[in-house]
Amino acid sequence: MFILLVKVQVKPELLDEFKSAILNNATLSVQRDPGCHRFDVLQQQDDPTKWVFYEVYDNEEAWVLHRSSAHFLAFKAVGDRALESRDVTKFTGINVKS
């Protein structure tokens, strides 16, 4: 599994627009993108400008395909204006079998 942990900080004046865009992107990613298994969106309780996304894909190729989707490109257009900072960390999922 290919996993992304994305941390962003959003400009306060664009929070509502950003929230709508990321929720649409996350929902459509899981529904439509082949190989996208999970897309969790978290907003920090004590600072609503800070967000974390937890994304799970079959492999990096599935993530690359996701980045060419119409819903991602629509989100990116908003994110490019709304984000103050972004940090992306890539992980390999390790499955523990009992």
Label each residue range with its predicted role.
Residues 40-49, 75-98:
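Glycine-rich beta-strand-turn "strand-cap" elements at beta-sheet edges
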Residues 24-36, 56-89:
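An amphipathic, aromatic/His-enriched active-site/gating alpha helix that lines ligand/cofactor pockets
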Residues 14-18:
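Short, conserved charged micro-motifs
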